[in-house]
Amino acid sequence: MRHRKSGRQLNRNSSHRKAMFSNMASSLVRHEVIKTTVPKAKELRRVIEPLITLAKTDSVANRRLAFARTRDNEVVAKLFNELGPRFAARQGGYTRILKCGFRTGDKAPMAYIELVDRPAAEEAAE
């Protein structure tokens, strides 16, 4: 029975899920918008929101915690230098999920997940 077990399995083992969400979080921080399936986008919120909250207070310990979750120095630098100050006044809710139809191969529901308060110049990047 799966009573009180939170999070989606997504037909992957735990190490695959952990690596996938680490990579997706890094991509979202780097590009500020990514296209993925709706269930993955909803689970990615649970990974990226605590990272941005962590980036609001810049310390060596917080940078090491962020690096442990993303394994990318560029992403950690952008988190603490750009995203932390940008979302300093916001109390959570840093991401937005926009549904964008279905994938052609298997009709999986697709969505864009993006950071709110994104600069207007980057909206044409995706």
Curated annotation (Swiss-Prot):
Top-level division of the source organism's lineage: Bacteria
Keyword terms: Ribonucleoprotein, Ribosomal protein
GO biological process terms on file: translation
Keyword Ribonucleoprotein among UniProt keywords: yes
UniProt cross-references to InterPro entries, sorted A to Z: Ribosomal_bL17, Ribosomal_bL17_CS, Ribosomal_bL17_sf
A Gene Ontology term for the protein's cellular component: cytosolic large ribosomal subunit
GO molecular function: structural constituent of ribosome
Pfam families: Ribosomal_L17
Subunit structure: Part of the 50S ribosomal subunit. Contacts protein L32.
Family: Belongs to the bacterial ribosomal protein bL17 family.
Protein name per its UniProtKB record: Large ribosomal subunit protein bL17
Source species: Vibrio atlanticus (strain LGP32)
